[in-house]
């Protein structure tokens, strides 16, 4: 699997799907390209300001002041436990992907968010063995090596172990559950 490299955006525990993509933006239609991009524009806009972009807080994920901006500068979200809790909302991992996020690294996930991420092929949900929110700062350059189960903070040169993706790795590499089924001639 390819490595993911880019800037990290750090959040705390219990980031729910309403914070990832607030309900007022669910009226956009993801099958219309111009509306699909708006999911990226409003990704993580529901996170309270003091919890956005840790450790300092107050760092917006997407600069909403720029009306033409639909993506973020961050390729990796680093979070604490229970990431993606709340309602079952397939739009949550879609919004992160549309914002340019390629992977989320969290201590644990709400299972429905994890499955929506894998099944839709939106973002790679990696699990850290230790809580990285106190080790990585928003803006740090990180590299995730899925084959060797490591996250390297390129800013500090520290490395951290990740749990293996296991059976879902093949689904992720295929681009989601439907693509995986087609490649296996299941569907």
Show the residue positions of the predicted features.
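Acidic, glycine-rich flexible loop/linker segments
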Residues: 118-187
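Conserved phosphate/anionic-ligand binding catalytic regions in large, soluble enzymes, centered on
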Residues: 15-16, 84-91, 172-181
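Feature captures the catalytic cores and cofactor-binding loops of soluble hydro-lyases/lyases
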Residues: 10, 19-21, 26-148
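Catalytic or ion-coupling anion/metal-binding cores of large enzyme and transporter domains
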Residues: 1-41, 154-160, 164-166, 179
């Amino acid at each position: 699997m390819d490595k993911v490299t880019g800037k990290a955006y750090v959040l705390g525990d219990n980031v729910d799907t309403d914070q990832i993509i607030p309900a007022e933006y669910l009226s956009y239609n993801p099958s219309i390209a111009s509306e699909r991009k708006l999911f990226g524009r409003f990704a993580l806009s529901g996170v309270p300001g003091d919890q956005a972009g840790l450790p300092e807080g107050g760092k917006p994920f997407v600069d909403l002041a720029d009306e033409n901006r639909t993506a973020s500068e961050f390729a990796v979200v680093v979070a604490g436990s229970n990431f993606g809790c709340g309602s079952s909302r397939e739009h949550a991992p879609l919004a992160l992907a549309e914002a340019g996020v390629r992977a989320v690294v969290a201590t644990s996930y709400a299972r429905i968010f994890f499955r929506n991420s894998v099944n839709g092929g939106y973002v790679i949900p990696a699990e850290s063995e230790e809580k990285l929110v106190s080790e990585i700062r928003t803006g740090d350059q990180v590299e995730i090596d899925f084959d060797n189960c490591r996250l390297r903070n390129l800013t500090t040169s520290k490395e951290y172990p990740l749990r293996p993706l296991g059976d879902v790795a093949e689904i992720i590499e295929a681009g989601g559950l439907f693509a995986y089924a087609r490649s296996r001639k299941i569907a």
